A protein has these predicted regions:
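Accessory, non-catalytic peripheral segments of nucleic-acid enzymes
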Residues: 37, 42, 247-379
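Divalent metal-coordination and catalytic microenvironments
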Residues: 8, 28, 48, 63, ...
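Binuclear metal-dependent phosphoesterase catalytic core
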Residues: 112-120, 124, 129, 222-287
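His/Asp/Glu-rich metal-coordinating catalytic cores
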Residues: 55, 84-218
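N-terminal active-site segment of His-dependent metallophosphoesterases
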Residues: 1-68, 72, 363-372, 376
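Short beta-strand segments at enzyme active-site cores
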Residues: 41-47, 79-81, 167-171
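A short helix->loop->beta-strand "cap" motif at the edges of active sites that frequently abuts
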Residues: 72-77, 166
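Catalytic-core regions built around general acid/base machinery
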Residues: 62-74, 194-203
Length: 379
C-alpha cells in the first residue's frame, strides 16, 4: 500500500503581511500532479489544515476544491485537526463526507475507532487522533493521572486497544521530544508540550503534523512530513517535500520524499545596498521570490524598502547588520529590564517587531504619550 503524507497546509496564512493563498493553491496543484504520477492508495493530512480556528471564506474554498479533486480520483483521504484548527469546524459534516471517502477526525471524546483499508497483505488500521492537550484527555478519563502531554497521549493511545498482529498507522499532531522546531510554530513555555516517542511503540507508521521541517524522530517510521511551503525565514534553507510511505507486510515500511517546487521561494540575501541592487547580483535570479534582505551599509539608506521593491517586489523584511545594530543588540542584552525606562522598553519592542528603530518623530510621540499616562495616574 502506498500512502501520501501531508500536514500543516495552514490555508489562509499571511507571512509578514503577504497572503499566501495563491501560493497555496499553486502548491496543492503540484501535490495533485505528484499524486497522479505516484498513484497512492490514500492521502493522509495530519492537521493544521487552516492557519486560524476561524478560517477565511477563501481558505475554506481552497480546501474544498482540494478535497473534491482527491475524491474525484477515488482516493480515500484521512484528515485530523491541529492546534491551529477548530476541531469542531474541521469535523463538521464529517459523517457525510465519509460517503465520498473523506474521513475526518471527530471532536475527541475518548474513543478513536480506526479506518480500515485493505491490500494484498491484509488490513491496515489507521487511527485519527486530533491535536490533544492534557485537559482534553482528563475530561474523558478523570480517574487517570495525567500531568503532562506524554501522559495524555499514553492514555489516549492506550484506549485504542491496538491489535499487534495487523499493521497500524496513527495520524497525530503533537511535538515529539527531540524534533527540531521553526519560528513559525507555536511554542510552549519550557517545552511542556513535548511527547515521548515511546508512546507510539505500537504503530508501524506515525504520520505527524505540527512541525514544519521534514524529519523523522525516534525512528524512521515516526515522521513529520513538514509544511508544503516555507512560512518563516527560519525555514529558508529547508527543502519542502511530499512524504510517500510504502507499506508491505507487517514490519516492512519504506519512506521516501518527492521535492516540492513553490510558485515563489522564500529566501534571504545580504550585502550593501549597491551590491544587492546591482544588475550582476540579481540577474538570472527569481527577483519575485519572497525575500528577507539584510543591508550591511553603515548608514541607513533613505526609502530603502521602496527602492528595493522596484527590483524585488515581494520584499517581506528588511534589516541592517552594521556596527550600530550590533551595538544596539549588545546593549539590549546587557541592560536588565528593571533598569530600563518605559520608553526604552517600548523602543526595544518596536525594534524587535519591525527590525528597525523608531524615527525621532515616533520617539517623541511615544515619550509624550507615556508622560501623559504617568500624569493621569499620579495622585
Amino acid at each position: 500500500m502506498r500512502l501520501i503524507h501531508l500536514s500543516d497546509l495552514h490555508l489562509g496564512k499571511r507571512v509578514n503581511g503577504f497572503s499566501m493563498l495563491e501560493d497555496q493553491r499553486y502548491i496543492l496543484k503540484e501535490i495533485l500532479r505528484i499524486i497522479d504520477e505516484e498513484r497512492p492508495d490514500a492521502v493522509l493530512i495530519s492537521g493544521d489544515v487552516y492557519d486560524k480556528a476561524v478560517p477565511s471564506a477563501e481558505a475554506v474554498l481552497v480546501l474544498d476544491e482540494f478535497l473534491c479533486q482527491l475524491a474525484q480520483r477515488k482516493l480515500p483521504v484521512l484528515m485530523i485537526s491541529g492546534n491551529h484548527d477548530s476541531a469542531e469546524r474541521v469535523a463538521f459534516g464529517g459523517r457525510l463526507m465519509e460517503r465520498s471517502g473523506v474521513y475526518v477526525s471527530p471532536v475527541y471524546d475518548g474513543a478513536v475507532q480506526p479506518i480500515v483499508l485493505h491490500d494484498a497483505w491484509g488490513e491496515v488500521r489507521i487511527y485519527l487522533l486530533p491535536f490533544l492537550k492534557p485537559a482534553h484527555v482528563r475530561r474523558c478519563f478523570p480517574d487517570e493521572t495525567i500531568d503532562s502531554y506524554t501522559d495524555a497521549l499514553r492514555v489516549a493511545v492506550g484506549q485504542m486497544e491496538i491489535d499487534a498482529g495487523v499493521r497500524n498507522l496513527l495520524l497525530t499532531h503533537q511535538f515529539v521530544t527531540g524534533a527540531a522546531r521553526c519560528e513559525s510554530e507555536e511554542l510552549s513555555v519550557g517545552g511542556a508540550d513535548q511527547v515521548d516517542a515511546s508512546v507510539f511503540d505500537g504503530f508501524d507508521y506515525v504520520a505527524l503534523g505540527h512541525l514544519h521541517g521534514p524529519q523523522s524522530v525516534g525512528g524512521e517510521h515516526i515522521r513529520y512530513c513538514g509544511s508544503p511551503l516555507k512560512y518563516s525565514f527560519s525555514e529558508a534553507k529547508q527543502q519542502k517535500s511530499v512524504t510517500l510511505i510504502e507499506l508491505a507486510e507487517k514490519g516492512q515500511v519504506q519512506v521516501r520524499t518527492v521535492p516540492l517546487v513553490p510558485r515563489h521561494d522564500l529566501r534571504e540575501i545580504r550585502g550593501t545596498y549597491l551590491a544587492v541592487t546591482g544588475k550582476s547580483f540579481y540577474d538570472g535570479t527569481a527577483t519575485d521570490d519572497y525575500l528577507h534582505i539584510t543591508l550591511t551599509d553603515e548608514e541607513d539608506v533613505p526609502n530603502a524598502i521602496g527602492k528595493l521593491r522596484a527590483i524585488y517586489p515581494n520584499l517581506m523584511k528588511l534589516d541592517y547588520d552594521n556596527t550600530r545594530t550590533r551595538g544596539a543588540v549588545q546593549l539590549e542584552e546587557a541592560a536588565p529590564v528593571e533598569e530600563l525606562s518605559p520608553l526604552d522598553l517600548f523602543a526595544q519592542f518596536y525594534r524587535q517587531q519591525n527590525n528597525q528603530p523608531m524615527t525621532q518623530a515616533q520617539t517623541d510621540f511615544v515619550r509624550d504619550l507615556i508622560e501623559t499616562i504617568w500624569e493621569e495616574d499620579a495622585p
